[in-house]
């Protein structure tokens, strides 16, 4: 588990570890403990529901991964998965794939 710290430099010095099964005192107020230690949560509007996915355009993938990605993920308060989507016209890619498939078929014919 990674420590809950903003900077990577502080991560090694930070003493509090984030554990998804441990509730902070603020979160614990919104839960009831039932028999057997089972917790019941009341719904709240501002809570993230896992899995959290951040959808980013493929055309800016290099920019996000090199420069902005670390700041985006550092400012996002929960674990998230990055998903890149195609935001450009993919017709040229489809034509290239068809040409490549035709070439491959021609190469493997006896």
UniProtKB/Swiss-Prot annotation:
<comment type="function">
    <text>Probable transcriptional regulator involved in developmental processes.</text>
</comment>
<keyword id="KW-0804">Transcription</keyword>
<feature type="region of interest" description="Disordered">
    <location>
        <begin position="87"/>
        <end position="110"/>
    </location>
</feature>
<dbReference type="Pfam" id="PF14998">
    <property type="entry name" value="Ripply"/>
</dbReference>
<keyword id="KW-0805">Transcription regulation</keyword>
<protein>
    <recommendedName>
        <fullName>Protein ripply3</fullName>
    </recommendedName>
</protein>
<dbReference type="GO" id="GO:0005634">
    <property type="term" value="C:nucleus"/>
</dbReference>
<keyword id="KW-0217">Developmental protein</keyword>
<dbReference type="GO" id="GO:0000122">
    <property type="term" value="P:negative regulation of transcription by RNA polymerase II"/>
</dbReference>
<feature type="short sequence motif" description="WRPW motif">
    <location>
        <begin position="18"/>
        <end position="21"/>
    </location>
</feature>
<dbReference type="GO" id="GO:0003139">
    <property type="term" value="P:secondary heart field specification"/>
</dbReference>
<dbReference type="InterPro" id="IPR028127">
    <property type="entry name" value="Ripply_fam"/>
</dbReference>
<dbReference type="GO" id="GO:0003714">
    <property type="term" value="F:transcription corepressor activity"/>
</dbReference>
<feature type="compositionally biased region" description="Acidic residues">
    <location>
        <begin position="87"/>
        <end position="99"/>
    </location>
</feature>
<comment type="similarity">
    <text>Belongs to the ripply family.</text>
</comment>
<keyword id="KW-0539">Nucleus</keyword>
<dbReference type="GO" id="GO:0009880">
    <property type="term" value="P:embryonic pattern specification"/>
</dbReference>
<feature type="region of interest" description="Ripply homology domain">
    <location>
        <begin position="50"/>
        <end position="85"/>
    </location>
</feature>
